[in-house]
Amino acid sequence: MTTFVKATFVEEKMADLSFFKEGKVYKVYYDEDRRNNMIEDEEGIAWFISHLANGEYHIYGTTLLAKFVTVEESL
């Protein structure tokens, strides 16, 4: 199943490297081989979703790198 999410927070070093941009919409999907939810960045590279809490998808390194919320189907 594919879900579309909007970036609500992107850590400065990630934004500088153009991985994700706040306010843009990205695709989240479940990868059977990796057995994990993945998110595609600006260049189509898949990132592991590190954490899902309160309806938010998070990517972590040593700190929170990015946060996303689900986009309504009508958008």
Protein language model features and the residues they cover:
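SH3-family beta-barrel domains
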Residues: M1-K13, L64-L75
